[in-house]
């Protein structure tokens, strides 16, 4: 793939790996583009590449840690990781972090079983198990009960039993069937800086969810960062720390989740879809 971007690069080649995270099989889970860089490119170039990739998130990383990162938690491989949607840079993305760990631990450091990532959300860690699963360690995110926003309820077309706000807006429904049947009008969502999560007790897992946000990808296939908020909620309501979860998007995804103090551990598999090269060509 050749992309004309602002700047002077000659014909700089950048590897691109598309990896499905939280995937039971090919064509499931959430795809992320993973792009290792020798050094950071200008932010506008990163944004253009993410827009061209047109996936929910593109993960860019470099082995060059910024001075304010401090020391990584251990001596395992550590990189500086950033996430971009097709529209803007974001503060946290679980599935793209897991996908990046899979690429690093499979391609660059096959003898290691842990990778650290310095991000806008601080240090994150992913471990690889003996069964080739990946364990993503995220900060547990709080939620506060609120009165449901009538405009949001109307746009989602659901009848929530409960509404909470935090990193995302959460509407708790009565059943898995209601979550599965929901047909939100995402374009009618009120102006929100956050995503909207529909969740309920599950028939096929301890809890289920779907994640919506206006933009290039209105429904996210599997959202690791949303589970950093959902796991503390459901662990408290169900009275146990170890939970199973399903995200009921068209692609679908399964997660095993643990609330460990102020951290959330998410376990899933990764499937590599493609490896390629992007040529950043000077515009003509």
Residue spans for each PLM region:
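Active-site proximal loop and beta-alpha junction motif in alpha/beta enzyme cores
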Residues: 3-92, 97-284
């Amino acid at each position: 793939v050749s992309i004309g971007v602002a700047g002077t690069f000659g014909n700089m080649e950048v590897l691109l790996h598309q990896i499905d995270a939280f995937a039971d099989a090919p064509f499931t889970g959430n795809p992320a583009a993973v792009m290792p860089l020798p050094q950071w490119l200008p932010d506008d170039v990163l944004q253009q590449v993410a827009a061209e990739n047109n996936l929910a998130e593109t993960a860019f990383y470099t082995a060059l840690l910024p001075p304010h990162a401090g020391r990584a938690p251990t001596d395992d491989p550590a990189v500086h990781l950033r996430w971009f949607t097709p529209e803007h840079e974001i503060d946290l993305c679980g599935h793209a972090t897991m996908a990046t760990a899979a690429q690093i631990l499979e391609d660059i450091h096959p003898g290691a079983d842990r990778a650290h990532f310095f991000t806008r959300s601080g240090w994150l860690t992913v471990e690889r198990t003996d069964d080739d699963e990946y364990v993503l360690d995220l900060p547990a995110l709080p939620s506060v009960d609120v009165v449901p926003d009538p405009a949001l309820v109307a746009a989602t077309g659901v009848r929530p039993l409960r509404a909470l706000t935090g990193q995302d807006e959460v509407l708790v429904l009565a059943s898995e069937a209601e979550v599965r049947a929901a047909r939100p009008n995402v374009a009618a969502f009120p102006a929100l800086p956050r995503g909207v999560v529909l969740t309920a007790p599950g028939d096929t897992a301890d809890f289920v969810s779907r994640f919506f946000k206006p933009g290039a990808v209105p429904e996210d296939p599997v959202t690791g960062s949303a589970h950093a908020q959902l796991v503390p909620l459901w662990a408290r309501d169900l009275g146990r720390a170890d939970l199973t979860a399903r995200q009921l998007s068209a692609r679908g995804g399964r997660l095993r989740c643990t609330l460990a103090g102020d951290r959330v551990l998410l376990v899933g598999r990764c499937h590599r879809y493609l490896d390629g090269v992007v040529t950043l060509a000077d515009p003509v």
